[in-house]
């Protein structure tokens, strides 16, 4: 787990590329309506489930339990490669206590599976601000057996963040990662911290989603003009500032031979990277923001002449 844009998918892909992760099934939970993380992880695991458009700790909790049950029986029937563990990548807004309660309680998941650990990524650049401003980010850190400070290559100083994390959760093992590179294996990250389960029970108080956070999904047509997109996104960041928490998506820009992956984290700049993706990878952009309506986001793109490139969709704001 880890707050929006902390680098969960980058780290998970790196961990799954190791030979000791060959027997790992993966469940990816996405907040928005586009399963981008699922597409970025394709090939990293032979056994993968996608839970999109909701959080596993509330709207998708039943679906998570059903997916775990499906995996269990498909494994026994040899319909999928044999696995010895399941990794769940939650949304950036999820409180992991709900997943912990389900797997540790008197449920089918609790009977089939044994809980191991919570691994929480904290953005080395924005982590201190996230812990102060967002209850979900602080809860994720407090629940962790392993705390990983990510993006250390981009952070000027992580001393203050380390001190904050030690105060918030002194039991967790602290790691550092850069571009997905971590000096610990998946096996090591599955080891629980001493006394962690008792501490987690005390922290399990129900969902802590930040009020007013919404997501919207803009569906792009092919041959999206790059200059107009760049200008529209620049206006988006200028208008909403830190309230624009996260944006991620896939675009097929005019004249480019490959689709591009779009990634943005609050306070940064958008990263646009050509990528080899599956043919069915959906083109579009998920925008996750605080106190911003989907209509406001769409209007900015329309104002830059991108209206004809936006396919008609039922844009939704998901209040958590």
Regions found by a protein language model. Give the residues of each.
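Amphipathic coiled-coil/heptad-repeat helices and related helical stalk/stem segments
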Residues: 64, 133, 158-161
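Structural motif
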Residues: 78, 110, 136-139, 208
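Extended, well-folded catalytic/binding cores that form a central cleft or groove in large enzyme
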Residues: 113, 128-133, 140, 168-171
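Nucleotide-state-sensitive switch-loop elements of NTP-binding domains
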Residues: 1, 6, 10-130
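Flexible loop/N-cap segments at domain edges
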Residues: 287
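Conserved phosphate/pyrophosphate-binding and hydrolysis machinery centered on Walker-type P-loop NTPases
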Residues: 93, 134, 219-223
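C-terminal accessory "lid"/substrate-recognition subdomains
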Residues: 139-280, 290-320
């Amino acid at each position: 787990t880890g707050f929006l844009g902390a680098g969960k998918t980058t780290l998970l892909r790196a961990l799954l590329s190791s030979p000791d992760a060959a027997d790992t099934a993966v469940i990816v939970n996405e907040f928005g309506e586009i399963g981008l993380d699922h597409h970025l992880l394709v090939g990293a695991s032979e056994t993968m489930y996608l839970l999109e458009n909701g959080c596993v700790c509330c709207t998708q909790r039943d679906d998570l339990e059903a997916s775990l049950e499906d995996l269990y029986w498909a494994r026994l029937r040899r319909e999928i490669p044999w696995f010895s563990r399941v990794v769940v990548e939650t949304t950036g807004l999820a409180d992991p206590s709900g997943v912990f309660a389900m797997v540790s309680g008197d449920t089918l998941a609790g009977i089939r599976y044994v809980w191991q650990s919570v691994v929480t990524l904290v953005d080395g650049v924005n982590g201190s601000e996230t812990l102060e401003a967002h209850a979900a980010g602080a809860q994720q850190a407090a629940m962790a057996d392993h705390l990983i400070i990510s993006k250390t290559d981009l952070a000027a100083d992580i001393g203050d963040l380390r001190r904050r994390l030690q105060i918030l959760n002194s039991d967790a093992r602290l790691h550092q990662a850069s571009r997905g590179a971590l000096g610990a294996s998946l096996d090591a990250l599955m080891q629980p911290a001493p006394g962690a389960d008792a501490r987690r029970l005390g922290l399990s108080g129900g969902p802590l989603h930040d009020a007013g956070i919404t997501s919207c999904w803009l569906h792009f047509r092919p041959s999206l003009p790059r200059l107009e997109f760049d200008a529209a996104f620049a206006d988006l960041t200028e208008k909403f500032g830190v309230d624009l928490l996260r944006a991620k998506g896939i675009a097929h820009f005019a004249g480019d031979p490959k689709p591009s992956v779009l990634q943005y984290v609050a306070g940064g700049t958008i990263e646009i990277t050509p990528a080899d993706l599956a043919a069915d990878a959906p083109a579009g952009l998920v925008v996750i923001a605080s106190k911003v309506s989907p209509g406001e986001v769409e209007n900015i793109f329309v104002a830059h002449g991108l209206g004809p490139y936006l396919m008609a969709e039922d844009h939704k704001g998901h209040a958590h």
